[in-house]
Amino acid sequence: MRKGITGVLLALALTIGAGSRAQYDRDYFYYVGRSFMIDNNFEDAIRTLNILLRFDDDAYEGYFLRGIAKYNLDDLLGAEADFTTAIEKNPVFTTAFTYRAITRSRLGNYDDALSDFAEAIELRPDLPNAYYSRGVTRLLNQQFREAIDDFDKFIRQENKVSDAYLNRGVCYLYLKDTTQAYANFETAIRTNRENPMSYNRRGELEMKQQRYKEAEADFDMAIRCDSNYLLSYFNRAIVYSSTNRPMQSLADFDRVLQLDSTNSLTYFNRAIVRSQIGDYNRALEDYDKVAFYSPENVLVYYNRAGIQAQLGNIESAVEDYSKAIELYPDFANAYLNRSRLRYLLKDESGSRRDRDIAQRKIAEYKTRLSDSTYSIYADTTHRFDRLLSFDANVAGSTFGRIASKSADNRLALLPLFRFTLRTPDSLSTVTAGRYHSQREADFRRRIDNRYLTLTARESNVPADSLVMLDKRYARELMAEPASWELLFQRGITQTLIKQYTNAVGTFTSAIDQYPANPFLYLNRSTTRAEMIDFISSIDNSYQRITIESDPAKRLQNSQSRTYNYDEAIADLNKAAKLYPDFPYTYYNRANLMALSGKLPEAYNDYTKAIELNPAFAEAYYNRGLVQIFMKDTRKGCLDMSKAGELGIPEAYEILKQYTALDR
C-alpha cells in the first residue's frame, strides 16, 4: 500500500508543472504527509511535504510537519529551520514555538529554547504542555527550582502524567532533597504502575542509600513491566555485585549487551566483575571491547594493564600504562605501576625515572588537595576497580567518554558520477532525476545506446553480458573506421570489466578524435580514479574519508605507499573548461580533492556544484562530511539535513550519530 501511494506521489510530482497550479491539491498532500508520519515513515513524509511546499510556499503547516519528521529522524538543525520558517509564516503558531523550543533544548541551546517557551506560554497560557517541556529544559539546564515550579504548574492541570512527578523527583534529587525525591517517585508509581522508569528511579535512589533489598525489588518490577528495559538490568547487576552475587551480576550485564552490544560502560563493569572472580582472560576481552569503543579513556588502559600483568604479559602491561600516561600525564599510579614492571624487565633507569616522576606527582597532589580531578589520579590510595553507575559518563565521573562511538566507525564519500551502462529500473540516482542538461542529453542521443546513463550507481548489467558486449565492440572497431562514439562505448565496457589501462587508452583515442567533448574527459577521469582505488585495494590500503571518535583525525592510509589523483583531476580541469556549467564535473573533482587530503578545495568544488544545481543531494552529503572533518560540525550537519531532505537516507544515520554524541 505504501509503495502504491509513493508511486502516485511521484507521478503527480512529474505531471505538475509551473503552469498547472490549479491541478495541485494542497489538502491531499498534507493528508498523505500526515499519514506517512502516523506510520512513522518520516522519509516518505518529507518527500511528500517537499511537493506540497514546492507549490505552496506559504503552507506553514507543511513546514511544521516536515520539521516534526526531521526531528524524529534526529535531524535537529533541519527541524529547527523548518519550525523557524513556520513561525515566520505564522507568528502566532504556538505549537511551532513549543516544538522549536524542544528542538533547541536538545541542541543544548537552552537560552533560545526558554525564550521560545516564554512566547508559547504568552500566546496560550492555558495549555499545559509548554510548562512540562520548559520544566525538562530547565532540568537539563540545571535550573532545578525553576523546573520544579514548571512541573507544579503542569501537574495542576494534568495530574495523571507520571513523567511529570518523575522529573520533579529528579530535580529534588539534584537539590539533595531525597525525601521529596522519594515521595515524587512513589507518586509516579501510583499514577502509572506500568512505567518501568519510575521503579528504576526509585531503585537508583535506594541503591545509593545502600538499601539493596528494596532497590532489587524495584529493578525486578521495572523488568517485569518491560523485559527489554536496559537500565534496570544494568542497575540490578550493580546490586548483585554489591551483595556478593557475581554470577547473577554477570548474567544481567550479559543481558544488557544482548540489548545493546556497543555499550562500553557495561563491558567495563563486566570486566571488573570477571577480574574479581579470577576470570582474567575474559576480563581482558571486555577491556579490549571498551578500548575499541572508547579509545581515549584513561581507565580502560590502566585497568587492562593490571590484567595483563596478572596474566604475565608484562610488555603489554607496560604499553597500556604508557597509553594511560599519554592520555593523562599526571597519573601517578600509572607511573608507579609502570616503574615496577620496568624493574621486572631489567629496565632500571626507566623504572627509576618513573618512580621519581610518580613521587613528584604525589607531592604536587598533596599541595592541591582541593582539586578533586587531579587528586583522583595522583592519590595512590584511590581504587579504580569499582563499578560505575549508568550515568557516570554524564555526571562528571572520572570515566569520561566511556560511551563514545567506535573508533573504527568509517563513513565514506558518495561515489563519482560517470557514464555507464544500466538496464532500466525503478530506482535512479537521487540528483539525476531532478537535473537536466540539454548538452548531456544531446550527447546521449548521439551515442544512441538506451542503456547509457549518467549515474553514481554501479552497473547492473551481468558480468558475462559485459564481456560479450566488449568483444562485440572490439570486432566492430576492427571491421570499420573507429568512431569516437564507438571508442567511448568500448572504454565503458573495458572499465566495467576492470581492464582499466586499456580503458584509459580507448578513452584517449576517443578524445584524440573529439578533443572538445567534456564528457569524454569526465569518463577518462573516473576510470583513472577507479584504477587507483582498485590498485590500492589490492595493497589493502584504502584511502578514503573516515569519521572517527577523535574528530582531529584526518584522511587515513594504512600503508606507507600513497596514490595521487593528479591525472584524473587534470581531466576534470579540462572538462570544466569545455563545459563550465556542468555540476557533476565539480562534484567529481571535489571527491578527488577530498581523497587527496585537500579539504578546502573539495569544499569549494562541492559549493560550485550546488550553485549550478541547488538540488544536488550527493554534493550536500559529501560537503557535509568534509565540513565535519574541518571541525565545522554544525554546518556539516546542516548540509546533511539538506541531503536527507533531498532523498539520501544515509544522511540521517550520520545525523543520528552526531546527535547521540552531543547529548
Features from the language model and the residues they span:
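Helix-start (N-cap) detector for alpha-helical repeat units in TPR-like alpha-solenoids
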Residues: 25-27, 60-61, 94-98, 128-129, ...
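Structural marker of alpha-solenoid helical repeat scaffolds
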Residues: 55, 89, 123, 157-158, ...
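Register position in tetratricopeptide repeats
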Residues: 38-39, 72, 106, 140-141, ...
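Eukaryotic alpha-helical solenoid repeat scaffolds
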Residues: 310, 330-487, 492, 535-564, ...
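Canonical tetratricopeptide repeat
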Residues: 31, 65, 99, 133, ...
